[in-house]
A protein has these predicted regions:
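Acidic/polar loop patches that form or flank catalytic/metal-binding clefts of enzymes
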Residues: 90-93, 153-160, 216-220
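A glycine-rich dinucleotide-binding beta-alpha-beta segment and adjacent secondary-structure elements
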Residues: 53, 59, 65-129, 159-172, ...
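Extended, charge-enriched "interface" segments that sit outside catalytic cores
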Residues: 189, 195, 206-211, 215-347
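Glycine-rich phosphate/pyrophosphate-binding beta-alpha loops
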Residues: 127-135, 191-193
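Internal hydrophobic alpha-helix adjacent to the cofactor/substrate pocket in enzyme cavities
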Residues: 14, 137-160
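A generic secondary-structure signal for well-formed alpha-helical elements
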Residues: 19, 89, 145-153, 174
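An anion/pyrophosphate-binding glycine-rich loop and adjacent beta-alpha core
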Residues: 1-80, 87, 167, 171, ...
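Hydrophobic, well-ordered secondary-structure elements that form the walls
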Residues: 141, 185, 308
């Protein structure tokens, strides 16, 4: 990590009048979370320095990506300013920074399959839908490709909803709300974040991928083995109790209240202070692991499902209620003008 300085900012300002952003030749809104260095200097004039992340481009190259220094200023201004950044005094430039402006179609014109409503068989994915980012483009390309293939075979479309995957959140946001700036996916955009965890991505999506022909049998077999072990673990924790003599020293060391009688492990695991590492010390747990083997991913999944079961169940119920409502389809040729209960503005 390094930083710009007042001297760097002064050099960059000399090129502002030649910048297409400042001249008005580029009028589109850029990604909100990736402002150019000239934009940062202007918008945050009170800051005398800005952070730069020095990112190697690869193992076998001397190229460095200067993250935080995106710019459309003239090449000579970029070079002069770069060499005033601490650590870059002898820098050589392979490719100068540049700005692009691209057109997009409002994604509200699309179906959930990413097929256009007006032209049958035409699918849009990526920047043309108003998104920015590699993953955002990649996931749309995947979904558009899947549905184009299914359509050509007269099969049912493949749609992920908001409680099944972040892909579902992204596509639903785009086609129902549209966008007036480059759209980027964030976990905060999803209302079912307890369900959309990185630790259960394989459980959520592997079977779907297999049904589509995108996942091989051996991968599905590994998932089924994991699910079987998770089921066995949860059954064990549900039926096994801890005795005060063994568990209380552990509870005391974690500032958790002691028990006075045998207590189910699931009840103890639901306490906020208790981690799997605490439970693993119990003789009954060690005997189970010795007999059934150790799968760290499955153990983590079982622990999460037990510890947060109340929250997970509640979120699943909420998601199912919304899904039931969303499954009530309104015909595309529905005549809203004939509804007396709708206001003139709504019609």
């Amino acid at each position: 990590i390094t930083y710009t300085s007042d001297e760097v900012h002064d050099i960059l300002r000399t090129g502002f009048e030649k910048s297409p952003m400042f001249q008005g030749r580029i009028q589109g809104l850029g990604p909100r979370y990736c402002p150019s260095i000239e934009d940062k200097i202007t918008r945050f004039a009170d800051k005398n320095r800005h952070q730069i992340f020095v990112e190697p481009e690869g193992w076998e190259t001397c190229e460095i990506y200067v993250n935080g220094f995106s710019t459309s200023l003239p090449e000579e201004v970029q070079m002069e300013a770069l060499r005033k950044v601490p650590g870059f005094e002898n820098a050589k430039m392979f490719r100068p920074g540049y700005a692009i402006e691209y057109d997009f179609f409002q994604p509200t014109q699309l179906k959930h399959t990413l097929e256009t409503k007006l032209v049958k068989g035409l699918y849009f994915a990526g920047q043309i839908n108003g998104t920015t980012g590699y993953e955002e483009a990649g996931c749309q390309g995947l979904m558009a490709g899947i549905n184009a293939c299914l359509s050509s075979q007269n099969k049912e479309p493949f749609i992920l909803n908001r409680s099944e995957a972040y892909i579902g959140v992204l596509i639903d946001d785009l086609i129902t709300k549209g966008t007036d700036e480059p759209y980027r996916m964030f976990t905060s955009r999803a209302e079912y974040r307890i369900l959309l965890r990185q630790d259960n991505a394989d459980i959520r999506l592997t079977q779907k991928g297999y049904d589509l022909g995108l996942v091989k049998q051996d991968r599905l077999d590994r998932l089924n083995e994991k699910l079987s072990y998770i089921e066995k673990l949860i059954a064990f924790f549900n039926t096994t109790s801890a005795i005060p003599e063994e568990i209380n020293p552990i509870l005391e060391s974690l500032n958790s209240s002691k028990i006075s009688q045998k207590t189910k492990l699931t009840k103890i695991m639901s306490r906020p202070q208790i981690s799997y590492g605490s439970i693993e010390k119990l003789i009954s747990v060690q005997e189970f692991l010795k007999e059934n083997g150790t799968d760290t991913e499955a153990i983590e999944q079982a622990f999460i499902q037990i510890k947060y079961s109340g929250y997970i169940s509640r979120e699943k119920d909420n998601a199912e209620k919304i899904t039931r409502l969303e499954n009530i389809s309104i015909p595309e040729d529905f005549e809203y003008t004939k509804l007396a209960s709708l206001s003139s503005e709504a019609k």
